[in-house]
Swiss-Prot record:
Its cofactor is Mg(2+); Mn(2+). InterPro entries: Idi_bact, IsopentenylPP_isomerase_typ1, NUDIX_hydrolase-like_dom_sf, NUDIX_hydrolase_dom. Mn(2+) binds at residues 41, 48, 85, 130, 132. Mg(2+) binds at residues 83, 103. The keyword Isomerase applies. Residues 46-183 form the Nudix hydrolase domain. GO terms for molecular function: isopentenyl-diphosphate delta-isomerase activity; metal ion binding. This is Isopentenyl-diphosphate Delta-isomerase. Binds 1 Mg(2+) ion per subunit. The magnesium ion binds only when substrate is bound. Its EC number is 5.3.3.2.
Length: 197
């Protein structure tokens, strides 16, 4: 399994576990340091850099993922196509493309920046806090998915109407609507007015 900011530790060359570091930022998104991943999510949370990806098929349907049950943060809930944290110093675009491939086994046929959003979302189930400066990306996926079962429990392509129905009955990540709403202008530009986003 590739070692990425989605995993909590990895083995160094001497066989010891190394913590995954996140990039801490100020309110303007300027890097101010690093923090261990779990520590950055402990209350009250530390503002750190993140990314969220929204991929659509050729019919304008959004690809959702259900987070794997084994994940320590927000397991089993539905969320956007891919989300995560760049390595310190890694460009958010590169991290978004890398993690999308690692989690879904596919590279977007198009990936474009869609702005940023800053939020603070406590997760009542885990007690963790998402205090993020999030870089948003929208794009297209045209290849068959090959999800990593350690990261993803299920996937679904949904229309805007189907998303509204699913969101009313199924659990979603605490950050999902915040990042989707912030990305909507770019989503509408990508999918066109008839898709209903």
């Amino acid at each position: 399994m590739p070692i990425t900011p989605a995993t909590s530790t990895h083995s160094s060359s001497n066989g010891t576990a190394e913590a995954i570091l996140l990039e801490l930022v100020d309110e303007n998104g300027t890097t101010i340091g690093t923090a261990e991943k779990l520590a950055a999510h402990q209350p009250p949370g530390q503002l750190h850099r993140a990314f969220s990806v929204f991929l659509f098929d050729e019919q304008g349907r959004l690809l959702l993922q259900q987070r794997a049950l084994g994940k320590y943060h927000s397991p089993g809930v539905w969320s956007n196509t891919c989300c995560g944290h760049p390595y310190p110093g890694e460009a958010p675009f590169a991290a978004a493309a890398r993690r999308t491939h690692e989690e879904l086994g596919v590279s977007p046929s198009l990936l474009a920046e869609a702005g940023t959003v800053r939020y603070n979302h406590p997760d009542p189930d885990s007690g963790l806090v998402e205090q993020e400066f999030n870089h948003l990306f929208v794009g297209l996926v045209q290849s068959p998915l090959r999800p990593d079962a350690e990261e993803i429990g299920d996937t679904a392509f949904v229309t805007a109407a189907e998303l509204a129905e699913r969101h009313a009955k199924d659990p979603f990540s605490s950050w999902f609507m915040t990042v989707l709403d912030a990305a909507r202008p770019a989503v509408r530009e990508l999918t066109g007015p008839s898709a209903g986003w």
